[in-house]
Amino acid sequence: MTTAARKTSTVPQIPKREGVKSGLPEHLAETRSTKLKRIYSELVKEFGAQGWWPLYDIQSRQLIYHPHDFTYPKNEQQAFEIIVGVVLAQRVTWKQAEAALKRLAAPSILDADRIAGITVNTLAEFIHGCGFHNQKAATLKAVTEKWLELKDRYKEMSVGDLRDAFLSVKGIGRESADSILLYALSKPIFIIDEYTRRFLKANFDFAAKDYDACRTFMEDNLERDVRLFQEYHALIIEWGKRNRI
């Protein structure tokens, strides 16, 4: 997933502290869990709180981040807006996705019932310019139907069942499903994207390409906490962008 550009700054040079490789006794080696926590602290210190997922503000007509405020999404409408944003951000820059989201928000189309009530062709016209707009319009219609089906009971559903439900929607893959679960529905699941794979390779020499292997690596070595997962994922993307990785 591609995200909005932020102001540039010096990228932290994360030192390698593989205890055994550096000559330390094995019992003093830095564990994966400890290293992940240390890197997280260094990234927060360098880049600050990220405040994902940005949400549309009616007054300013801009997408606003909310660093340090983990009460978002505050309602079903904001949760749905994030779901829409996840779909729009597939395979395009965040700038393109943001423009399409604004085009939906301005005439108040950014609503589950409204989207459910218009045709795929009409929806495609609103998001034209976002890339793959016809395909995404069909996905948006399908994921909207799924959301309307689940919105009254998703809080009681297990992460696995909820994930499977969104994966059943054509056009929703693992990265998109996990983005929906983590940011829209506040479920503790770690998102794996290309930046995360490069992060694992650079800092842990972990080169697995399998999505779930990478997700297991992160989840097994971090406290299973929604806030931590949200911030860490956003920070990894910021790290990748600053390093041009």
Language model region names:
Residues 196-245:
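Hydrophobic secondary-structure block in the mid-to-C-terminal portion of proteins
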Residues 80, 119, 136, 158-162, ...:
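Short, conserved alpha-helical segments within structured domains
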Residues 115-119, 123-124, 162, 166, ...:
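Short, well-structured alpha-helical segments that form the helix of a local strand-helix-strand
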Residues 102, 125, 136, 148, ...:
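Alpha-helix boundary/interfacial micro-motifs
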Residues 22, 65, 172, 215-219:
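Short amphipathic alpha-helical surface micro-motifs
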Residues 85-88, 140, 144, 157-206, ...:
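Catalytic DNA-binding helix-loop module of base-excision-repair DNA glycosylases/AP lyases
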Residues 96-110, 153-162, 194-200, 210-218:
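Short alpha-helical "patches" and their helix-cap loops
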Residues 1-156, 224-228, 232-245:
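N-terminal polyanion-binding entry modules of DNA glycosylases/AP lyases
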